[in-house]
């Protein structure tokens, strides 16, 4: 794969954020590129890394033909981890998903783990290892996207994955999903740190307007979230920046070493919260001993602009408003946010009709890092008590 080399970067403490890199050519063999402004990641190295990367697909009541396309596009070497929060009664959409996965496995013999987010055996495993952050007042796992991603991470850790990538299940273009996973691998191969995150910036996010396709560059929420994440950095460096373009990147990946030390917020705030936490904790040289290896190696964040556009399910204006509120709430409540920044966020949310005059954004609910969870014990409990766990080739 040929990509623009990461020339410009923003350094914030131990955190390096690379400017967005465009994919120039999807598939290459030779390692020799005479131009220093281009990075070449040979096909063989990408395919070697894919075998060490689990791809996590959280889903909830998605269209089955979209799920089918997404699964078929994930490179065969990658273990697939599906965490579903779909209905199990009236109608039982989860059963339909299970039937689809079984058929997909029979055709492909892909490596797959599947589980339902509301599985009582899964909740029991969290309870017994003392990790109750993910549970609701009834002792069941909450319904948020962040919770599903965290379950997927633990399953990935249990099977020994060194890298984890996330893809949404509602993508209309299967070929785009195939590219996303290879983009993740390319990002990891460019990194010099074991604590690396790769976030994707869609080349276009097309919308149907007046009967034709309009290839929009920015999503509605992303534009605003990125603006405030950049302000968060700028107000501490005193230099204006536009480096961050992937604040709401649902399609992102990280090394397991980074994933297991990050706390995760719930629901749709999870992607911007990852960035906010990394900047808060590793953007200053404080309490270095707790994470000495992280500070020694540094955290690298790569942003890659995809070759493919991103078509996904339109979930309506209310979904957009909820995403915007939860995304900006993570920045509003950050320890790095200044009074001036908070005032601007409040004004924006009120101007969009999302908050009333005297309301504040809700404080994000945060779940502890998974590093201290005894993974073998947790997995043994899941396997012994789950009613929905399916394992194929894993």
Swiss-Prot record:
GO terms for cellular component: cytoplasm. The keyword Membrane does not apply. Its main location: cytoplasm. Pfam families: Osmo_MPGsynth. GO terms for biological process: mannosylglycerate biosynthetic process. Its EC number is 2.4.1.217. The keyword Protein transport does not apply. It is found in: Cytoplasm. Its cofactor is Mg(2+). It catalyses: (2R)-3-phosphoglycerate + GDP-alpha-D-mannose = 2-O-(alpha-D-mannosyl)-3-phosphoglycerate + GDP + H(+). InterPro entries: Nucleotide-diphossugar_trans, Osmo_MPG_synth. It is an enzyme of class 2 (transferase). Keywords: Cytoplasm, Glycosyltransferase, Magnesium, Transferase. One of its GO terms (molecular function) is mannosyl-3-phosphoglycerate synthase activity. Belongs to the glycosyltransferase 2 family. Transfers a mannosyl group from GDP-mannose to phosphoglycerate to form mannosyl-3-phosphoglycerate (MPG). The enzyme is absolutely specific for GDP-mannose and 3-phosphoglycerate, and transfers the mannosyl group with retention of configuration. This is Mannosyl-3-phosphoglycerate synthase. The lineage of its organism: Archaea, Methanobacteriati, Methanobacteriota, Thermococci, Thermococcales. The gene is mngA.
